[in-house]
């Protein structure tokens, strides 16, 4: 959360992001609500044509673009951990970021941050080798991820901008990690509950969050995003992209 003060009145700012370009949701409808788009780079979902379509619309409506990098695993939608060497993973991340960057620039925008997807997102919370590979492959981009994990710790240690992310549509474990999707209740589906949870996360002081994510592949994602945005704005938050 960022704070601005104008005329003595403090405004709290937060980002609302969603995973896009995965061919499982209405990208255009979500881009009308969110402020940042985590764009699939072809390794778990998406294609050059889809990346271009998302980037064009994001540029048109003023939504920030981020590279959603993944294991090379379209069969499992990037949700299975893979044993990949650091060298290979670094090359794969660099390929994804580079491809999306070229497309984004051609559409009049740019890649503003990197965020791992699925199994890789959770792996780099505790795996130093893979976390370092993601950082090495993503240049100097700001890094969006789960607070308290190795990825963000390593990123901060080398001077990268670190962005803390929260998930109002997911259940949490006591240690701050997300409940695995395989467990009952891991994914929340009631829009009102998700919206209330979003405000709770936005107001928490430790860790302070920079962005909230609404999963684009969850049924009702567009309605969830609208509910979250309405609740955040009603709570006094201004929304802006990363």
Predicted regions mapped to residue ranges:
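N-terminal glycine-/serine-/threonine-rich phosphate-binding loop
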Residues: 2-63, 102-106
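Hydrophobic faces of well-ordered beta-strands that scaffold small-molecule active sites
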Residues: 14-18, 37-39, 65-69, 112-116, ...
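Active-site-adjacent beta->alpha loops and helix N-cap segments on the catalytic face
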Residues: 27, 46-59, 124-131, 148-155, ...
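Glycine-enriched alpha-helix->loop->beta-strand junction motifs that scaffold or abut catalytic
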Residues: 33-37, 59, 137-141, 157-163
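Catalytic beta/alpha-barrel core
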Residues: 39-44, 89, 123-124, 140-149
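Glycine/small-residue-rich loop that forms an oxyanion/phosphate-binding "nest" at active or ligand-binding sites
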Residues: 74-116
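Active-site rim beta-loop-alpha module in soluble metabolic enzymes
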Residues: 150-203
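C-terminal alpha-helical cap/extension of soluble enzyme domains
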Residues: 180-242
């Amino acid at each position: 959360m960022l704070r601005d003060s104008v005329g003595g009145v403090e405004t709290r700012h937060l980002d609302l992001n969603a995973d896009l370009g995965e061919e499982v949701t209405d990208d255009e409808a979500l881009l009308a609500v969110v402020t940042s788009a985590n764009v699939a780079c072809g390794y778990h979902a998406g294609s050059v044509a889809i990346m271009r379509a998302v980037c064009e619309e994001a540029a048109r409506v003023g939504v920030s673009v981020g590279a959603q990098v993944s294991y090379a695993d379209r069969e499992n939608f990037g949700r299975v951990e893979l044993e990949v060497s650091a060298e290979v993973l670094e090359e794969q991340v660099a390929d994804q970021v580079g491809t999306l960057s070229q497309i984004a620039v051609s559409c009049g925008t740019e890649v503003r941050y990197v965020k791992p997807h699925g199994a890789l997102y959770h792996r780099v919370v505790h795996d130093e080798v893979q976390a370092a590979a993601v950082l090495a492959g993503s240049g100097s981009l700001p890094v969006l991820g789960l607070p308290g994990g190795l990825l963000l710790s390593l990123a901060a240690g080398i001077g990268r901008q670190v962005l803390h992310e929260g998930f109002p549509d997911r259940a949490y474990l006591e240690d701050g990690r997300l409940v695995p999707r395989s467990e009952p209740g891991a994914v929340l589906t009631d829009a009102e509950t998700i919206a209330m949870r979003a405000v709770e996360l936005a107001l928490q002081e430790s860790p302070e969050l920079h962005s909230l994510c609404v999963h684009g592949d969850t049924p009702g994602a567009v309605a969830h995003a609208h509910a979250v945005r309405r609740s955040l704005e009603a709570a006094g938050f201004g929304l802006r992209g990363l």
